[in-house]
């Protein structure tokens, strides 16, 4: 039950944002030292998925651990996770599947900014943040209130629980906004294309006006940092992180969680198809001209953009989905849009439940290329008696059925027609086990081996033990069952809703 975790390597602690048992929002600092496991004969700290003995090694901070890992060549390292995730797993690995774990609501700021596009030709560049911010709107999901800060004349809100803050200049707007932000820090801040525009523009503009130290106030632990990444189009951009507050782009959420191709990912198009309403229409040439000629409509435009996000989240619950995904792997919420951290965390937790620790290989380890998934070649020609099967969740159920998991893998067939054992029982099969020992068996002996030792044979010729359920099959089975239960509940609720609608319609007809 957490809202965020921020690790500080300099004071060896984690700043944890959580709740009390009765739902009060609290922040607390807890001592924490990162660690990892190493293989050592006779060690008793833990057991790896390979059944080897492990020794726990603790470090003063993450910098010391990284230096150790960088200097450790060609050695298997275990449970070398990020400090925040390691801390969260230690704290919550036995609770994260409990429905009560997510019982308290998060404080989400849905936001949108406008800038003075008349001050400079062309579209404003977030990295430069050269023109003033003239409008910011935030919707607070916890208080159900809207706050707008603007530079021009007074504005009378038409929406309930909407407060307009008139500011004399941009400096006052920024100061008031930051005071509001830090009066009760959000758990998540989100907007449409906010990682591409709003967040970088806010941070760079604030730094330009007040300096780097001022921007640190956006974080409850005073830590705001950026890192350079390349977009799919090859453009270098800065992705910002505010420790203690998850920055999540709602457009990225929509792309990740909404099925099917879309003609456009503009907020106007998506809100039209999802909600049946779009952005505020205007006749001005640009938003810059609109701000100069009709300030009220300009503010309406900005507020409507935020309230479209509110309505999208009310309908789609994508931020709630991101929260549930993050809890599965004990990560901070922004990691839900990735794959590695959540999956690694979920597997590490499942391994712990089965009394094992997973490997996390150092970056400098030489890695061999992975062979792609098995695809059977089609047989050309006219076929008779064709049957088409639609298998429910084929890949997950294949993993469960064959017990495919790193620790259950025994070896692989390297020679022989193992698919034709029934027709050629005397043919020879050669297998290589994980210890690199090679055995050649007759087809008949190979079949006996599979049955006696409870071994599953995949179409790619890989051998998996069936003696005990693997980590991945266990995890997938659990998630699959939860999915089935959720779909059953949805089906029951739809039937219940249909009955309610019939009753209402019947009463309306009688009236």
Q: Predicted regions span which residues?
A:
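Conserved RNase H-like, two-metal-ion catalytic cores of nucleic-acid enzymes
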Residues: 3-44, 95-188
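Active-site-proximal helix-loop-helix substrate-binding element of RNase H-like nuclease domains
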Residues: 146-151, 156-164, 168, 185, ...
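Extended, Lys/Arg-enriched charged tracts that mediate electrostatic binding to polyanionic substrates
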Residues: 89-95, 100-119, 218-240, 348-364
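Short helix/loop capping segments that flank catalytic or ligand/cofactor-binding pockets
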Residues: 118-121, 147, 199-200, 256-258, ...
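Common nucleic-acid-contacting/processivity interface regions adjacent to the catalytic cores
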Residues: 285-403, 412-419, 504-511
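Short glycine-rich phosphate-binding loop at a beta-alpha junction
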Residues: 186-194, 325
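Non-catalytic nucleic-acid-binding interfaces of large nucleic-acid enzymes and RNP effectors
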Residues: 1-84, 208-241, 276, 280-281, ...
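Helical catalytic core of nucleic-acid polymerases
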Residues: 391-511
